[in-house]
């Protein structure tokens, strides 16, 4: 009888819980490659945005970033923003690293406070934010770069890469 009552209580709690809305992106300010202020306001986006939390020393970031560049190139700069938020990177030179890798993302330097806002503790972290400010994709730890590219293309309505 007690188990039956417990099951009923759990079921009632589950049914009474409202549907969970998608996570909302959090506004932030950061410094760009030349020290300019970058003001990310998710409720006022004109196009979707990818937030990539990375570090120059991170081999997983290095593996993921070319796939993200393919997505960025396919979407076009007028249809997608990509912010490469450098964090946990005291000794690296993110400007030189992006240049060397031929990656054209918007660099955000010293992004540790932004990573903390999003609960990112390791690299790479990746979020796709739609024009309503909803986080519609999060890279799950361990997702292969190819899988991330496919997911982003799907969410952005882009064709698969040939």
Task: Identify the function of each model-found stretch.
Residues 1-5:
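Positively charged n-region of N-terminal signal peptides that target proteins for export
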Residues 7-16:
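Bacterial N-terminal signal peptides
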Residues 17-21:
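Sec/Tat signal peptide C-region and signal peptidase I cleavage site
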Residues 24-25, 63-66, 73-111, 123:
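Conserved segment of the thioredoxin-like fold in thiol-based oxidoreductases
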Residues 27-49:
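A short beta-strand-turn-helix
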Residues 47, 97-103, 111-154:
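Thiol/disulfide oxidoreductase modules built on the thioredoxin-like
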Residues 50-51, 82, 126:
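Hydrophobic beta-strand anchors of alpha/beta hydrolase catalytic cores
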Residues 53-70:
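Conserved redox-active cysteine motifs that mediate thiol-disulfide chemistry
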């Amino acid at each position: 009888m007690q188990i039956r009552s417990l099951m009923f209580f759990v079921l009632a709690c589950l049914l009474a819980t409202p549907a969970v809305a998608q996570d909302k992106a959090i506004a932030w300010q950061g410094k760009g490659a030349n020290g300019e202020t970058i003001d990310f306001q998710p409720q006022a986006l004109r196009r979707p945005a990818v937030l990539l939390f990375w570090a120059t020393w991170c081999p997983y970031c290095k593996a993921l970033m070319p796939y993200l560049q393919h997505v960025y190139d396919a979407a076009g700069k007028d249809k997608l923003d990509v912010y490469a938020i450098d964090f946990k990177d005291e000794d690296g030179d993110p400007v030189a690293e992006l240049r060397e890798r031929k990656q054209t993302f918007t660099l955000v330097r010293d992004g540790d406070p932004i990573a903390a806002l999003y609960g990112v503790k390791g690299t790479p972290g990746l979020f796709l934010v739609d024009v309503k400010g909803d986080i519609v994709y999060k890279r799950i730890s361990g997702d292969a770069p190819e899988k991330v590219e496919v997911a982003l293309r799907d969410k952005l309505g882009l064709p698969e890469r040939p």
